[in-house]
Amino acid sequence: MSASPIDQILGAIQRPTIDRPFGVHLWPIFDKAFTAIKGYHPQDFDFQPHVTPMSTMKETAALIFTYYVVIFGGRELMRNRPAFKLNGPFMIHNFYLTAISGILLALFTEELIPTLYNKGLFFAICDVKGGWTNHLVILYYLNYLTKYLELIDTVFLVLKKKPLTFLHCYHHGATALLCYTQLIGLTSVSWVPITLNLMVHVVMYWYYFQSARGIRIWWKEWITRLQIIQFVIDLVFVYFASYTYFTSTYFKWMPNAGQCAGEEFAAFAGMGIISSYLLLFISFYIATYKKDGKRPTGRKAARSLKDAELPDIAAITQGKIQPAKKANGNAAAATPGRVTRSRKA
């Protein structure tokens, strides 16, 4: 009697090593699945900027623009309609994003540990043979495509008539753009923010999957903490890689570690977008989890900003939003009660 595929995999598991950190080689398993779907081996994938699907700025901009049209148009369509429950589809959405993130993270880990151990950190983040191998490029590309799946997060918010906040909408659109710029920019340091992001997403989407099941989990606050830690580490690596690139290229008299692979526009995009994430998520954390102190601070302002919905265009054009009236020399306007919510449904 022949063994089942699961028995074969379990039988192949050996003691973990540097080249086989999980006790079994994951790439051959991924190779079989990828080949069955695409008809060719993943290592034969040839990413060509402006040729490979979704590798042009026009395509990326069109999809991001469509995303914003859909969510804001959808909000208008849902204005006088009851909210959908969608608990089942929401559970499925969060479960498959948890699974995808976990699988990609495991594949990245298997590829990177031998490089880090044998060649060192600088080689892994700055040399094309370290951070831009054929195996890593296909993983970068697949990770980039998942950013468009994650846009469905906001569609659930719209259909469930949840508020659309600036942080949520900006973060989702900007992340798709960020992954595009790094993929086109051939930045070998990309694996650092990507693997950290995948790790956070495994935790985050699993949390929301369990929440949709009605299970209360106490560590929700730690998701935002992990995101902030992620952005800090990202910026350390991205700023270092950018610094050593620019100094070794244009300011050779300054201390530097040598050349670092990647395009200049990708460096500026990475530094700018991730820096904005750090500032926004710190503000979100303070506004959501830190109580106001006795002394006046910026926390109340941060909380107001965090809870504010994005402008309602229909209400503005129809003249339903009136300018604030002044009373006793201070601007005062009637506002609805705050709606506290996280960045997810």
Enumerate the language-model features and the residues they cover.
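Generic alpha-helical transmembrane segments
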Residues: 195-205
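Membrane-helix and juxtamembrane interface regions of eukaryotic multi-pass membrane proteins
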Residues: 1-193, 211, 215-229, 233-338, ...
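Surface-exposed charge patches
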Residues: 208
